Amino acid sequence: MMKGQLAGLMKQAQQMQENMKKMQEQLALIEVEGQSGAGLVKVTMTCRNEVRRVAIDPSLLADDKDMLEDLVAAAFNDAVRKAEATSQEKMSGMTSGLPLPPGFKLPF
């Protein structure tokens, strides 16, 4: 590899690293909401999987504890899926020119 090509590659890698850091900061600000039980349980989290809020409809508080736990877990899982999808969508622009294998997720 020629010296100029190596320098260009290093510069490109540094730019990508800076862009990844900026994207991670942006993802920390984006919130998604997962729901279950037709919206009776809601989990709001960032795209970095930090839970911000859990909202439970008061009508569920007198119900079966096991059912409520299942609904909370389902809402959490829904929020995680939405956060992952949003993150992949935002990152796809950064990785469009890279020869990455299918299904490869960034950040590593």
Curated annotation (Swiss-Prot):
Q: Does the keyword Cytoplasm apply?
A: yes
User: Where, if anywhere, are coiled coils annotated?
Assistant: none
Residue ranges under compositional bias (Polar residues)? 85-95
Return the Gene3D superfamilies for the record. Nucleoid-associated protein YbaB-like domain
Q: Where is this region: Disordered?
A: 84-108
Q: Where in the cell is it found?
A: Cytoplasm, Nucleoid
The Gene Ontology terms for molecular function here are: DNA binding
Compositional bias per record (Pro residues), positions renumbered to this chain: 99-108
Q: Which InterPro entries match?
A: YbaB-like_sf, YbaB/EbfC
Provide the Gene Ontology terms for cellular component: bacterial nucleoid; cytosol
Q: Which UniProt keywords apply?
A: Cytoplasm, DNA-binding
Main localisation, per the record? cytoplasm
Family of this protein? Belongs to the YbaB/EbfC family.
Known function: Binds to DNA and alters its conformation. May be involved in regulation of gene expression, nucleoid organization and DNA protection.
The record ties this protein, via PANTHER family, to:
NUCLEOID-ASSOCIATED PROTEIN YBAB
- HAMAP family, per this entry? DNA_YbaB_EbfC (MF_00274)
**Quaternary state and partners of this protein?**
Homodimer.
What this protein is called in its record is: Nucleoid-associated protein BMA1360
